[in-house]
UniProtKB/Swiss-Prot annotation:
Stretches assigned to the PPM-type phosphatase domain: 48-292
UniProt protein name: Probable protein phosphatase 2C 1
Membrane spanning residue stretches: none
Record keyword Lyase present: no
GO cellular component: chloroplast
PROSITE patterns in the cross-refs: PPM_2
Reaction it catalyzes: O-phospho-L-seryl-[protein] + H2O = L-seryl-[protein] + phosphate; O-phospho-L-threonyl-[protein] + H2O = L-threonyl-[protein] + phosphate
Cofactor mode of binding and number, as noted: Binds 2 magnesium or manganese ions per subunit.
Binding, Mn(2+) 1: 79-80
Record keywords, A-Z: Hydrolase, Magnesium, Manganese, Metal-binding, Protein phosphatase
Binding of Mn(2+) 2, residues: 79, 210, 283
Cited SMART domains: PP2C_SIG, PP2Cc
Region (Disordered): 1-29, 300-331
Amino acid sequence: MAASSTATRLSPPRLHAPTTPSPHLPLRRSRFSPLRAAKLEAVLTIGTHLIPHPRKAETGGEDAFFVNGDDGGVFAVADGVSGWAEKDVNPALFSRELMAHTSTFLKDEEVNHDPQLLLMKAHAATTSVGSATVIIAMLEKTGILKIASVGDCGLKVIRKGQVMFSTCPQEHYFDCPYQLSSEAIGQTYLDALVCTVNLMEGDMIVSGSDGFFDNIFDQEIVSVISESPGVDEAAKALAELARKHSVDVTFDSPYSMEARSRGFDVPSWKKFIGGKLIGGKMDDITVIVAQVKAVMIPDDEGVDEEKGQGDEQGSAVAVASSEQKEDSITT
């Protein structure tokens, strides 16, 4: 059965324009282009951090992710299902290839900012044996974030110090999430949870694999975000905190709390003496932190006219692109 839904519109898109100059001051002419109409577009500034499972550090773990700064910005996380190792299959191969194809098909005109369609194309092209949970998020220039997710990779939006949106994990039963697979019995893009969220300038997006969200609470995420000077620092700090919790046998983690709520616990004799299922969950930990920013984009009108005025504007655009564009696949 397909599990597709759309999130409620949370707020109208709002991108703040710069303050209007005083009428008593002369207008300053841009040194890059003639005065003309301009528009605001939403873009993502993205930071990432990955920490493999302690026992998989030498191989890099089974998580993979993809980040691209073109247009508004795109990122994706895939978590290879470790159970395939019992069949002598490297679980990392499927997740890595899936992310590689996500990068390739992002440039396909047919995708056109549709993460579910991108998921379909990337999955269809993946030939490695295995399976993975996955989430893809794409920001349109209007500030609309489109999400497609299969399984228990997650995403949260933080606005003004509060979590105002979270994806919901999909699972067959506890600890058995939906997953894209090389086998016919697995899920497909039609089973994806599809969400649309209207974002505002300054909103923070935190996404990652279940190894991250199983070991950290919302209030900790909000606290780290508020204390971090940038997205790179935030992603690293969040991953390190989740890693610390994951190896702490006394930490009552979100994972252990969920397990107890589903009926999993220590034997009765341990309960009798006050024992309970507790501790973090060791796993690969992938964290992506993105901040929504508004950039002023000149209107297309008059572009041809400017091309004859020298190379200065082209250089400015090239510098902006090199600072904003990030296109990578990391495992």
